[in-house]
Curated annotation (Swiss-Prot):
Belongs to the RapZ-like family. InterPro entries: P-loop_NTPase, RapZ-like, RapZ-like_N, RapZ_C. Residues 286-302 have a biased composition (Basic and acidic residues). GTP binds at residues 64-67. The keyword Nucleotide-binding applies. Pfam families: PapZ_C, RapZ-like_N. It comes from the Bacteria. HAMAP family: RapZ_like (MF_00636). Keywords: ATP-binding, GTP-binding, Nucleotide-binding. This is Nucleotide-binding protein Jann_0539. ATP binds at residues 17-24. Displays ATPase and GTPase activities. Residues 278-318 are annotated as: Disordered.
């Protein structure tokens, strides 16, 4: 037993099982729960990985039977050695699936089995099951994915390893300029270009939607409150649903012409509200500084053109 005042034991979870059963789904779910995940770790590197002080974060180690030095007995030995170390708690998780379902999955994806690339997938499945049999017998946790979808597999991992905590879904609130195209990472996009534009108020043009007077100007649009209310209602519906489905990251983007005033205003207000409700929120104003520099360049160019036109005796059109 560790001394009473020492740090709690570091958690290490070994994940293994046949190809196609869902190892990657499980290791990704553990990573979303806060584990430091290492995929396809060769067993020969395990001692070096665990040298020194125990890690601060729990470890999830995916052991692939296709790796060159794989041996079920060596993995069991490494696991049992770690299990006896008071500085660690260890779990051996076996991801299983019925051979017929594995064969169907290979057929649907038209992939070859890695252990029998030139033969029927059934041959590779049989070879792998024999290799892994001792691990299946020794496992602390067995997850049979035969009847499970990807989402239900994730839910099972969460149930087993989150200690009744749902995984945090990180939400990024972004503002952007339509002149620079839609952000490809956005899951939800709201177009703010119909709202009144502070760009045309000289005292606000150089400011942005992070400032209260710009926000107040945008909020004076008669449609603003209804627009914001509808957005809030939609997010109240969708965010819990996305979280329930196992989504770990969500990007909500607000766009306007320059990405400086209206989109930033809505992004700021939405991020503040979600944070107050307990969501894990980050903000990114993608184009706000670019818009400022471009406006400055345009103003200098306009001044130069005005001066040139005045010299020629012509007035420049606004």
């Amino acid at each position: 037993m560790p001394p009473p005042n020492s740090a709690p034991p570091a958690q290490v979870v070994f994940v293994t099982g046949p190809s196609g059963a869902g190892r990657s789904t499980v290791i990704n779910a553990l990573e979303d729960l806060g584990f430091e995940a290492i995929d396809n770790l060769p067993l020969s590197l395990l001692p070096r990985l665990l040298e020194g002080a125990p890690p601060d974060r729990p470890l999830a180690l995916c052991i692939d039977p296709r790796t060159r030095d794989f041996d079920a007995r060596d993995l069991i030995h490494a696991y049992e050695k770690l299990e006896q170390d008071p500085a660690y708690t260890a779990d051996l998780v076996f991801i299983d699936c019925e051979p017929a379902t594995l064969q169907r999955r290979y057929s649907e994806t038209r992939r070859r089995h890695p252990l029998a690339p030139d033969a029927d997938p059934a041959d590779g499945i049989a070879i792998e099951r024999e290799m892994l049999a001792p691990l299946r017998t020794r496992a602390d946790v067995l997850i049979d994915t035969t009847p499970l979808t990807v989402h239900r597999t994730r839910d099972e991992v969460i149930r087993l390893f989150a200690l009744d905590r749902a995984p945090a879904m990180s939400i990024q609130i972004m503002s952007f300029s339509y002149r620079r195209a839609l952000p490809i990472s956005a899951d939800l996009v709201f177009d703010c270009r119909f709202l009144r534009n502070p760009h045309w108020a000289p005292e606000l043009r150089a400011k942005d939607g992070r400032q209260s007077d710009v926000q107040a100007y945008v909020a004076q649009d008669a449609r603003f409150e209804a627009f914001r209310t509808q957005i809030n209602a939609m997010l109240d519906l969708l965010l819990p649903a996305f979280k329930e489905e196992g989504k770990s990251h969500l990007t909500v983007a607000f766009g306007c012409t320059g990405g400086r005033h209206r989109s930033v205003t809505l992004a700021e207000l939405t991020a503040r509200r979600l944070a107050e409700e307990g969501w894990q929120v980050s903000k990114r104003h993608r184009d706000v500084d670019k818009d400022a520099s471009e406006n400055s360049d345009r103003d200098r160019g306009a001044s130069a053109r005005t001066a040139a036109s005045t010299d020629d005796g012509e007035a420049e059109q606004p």
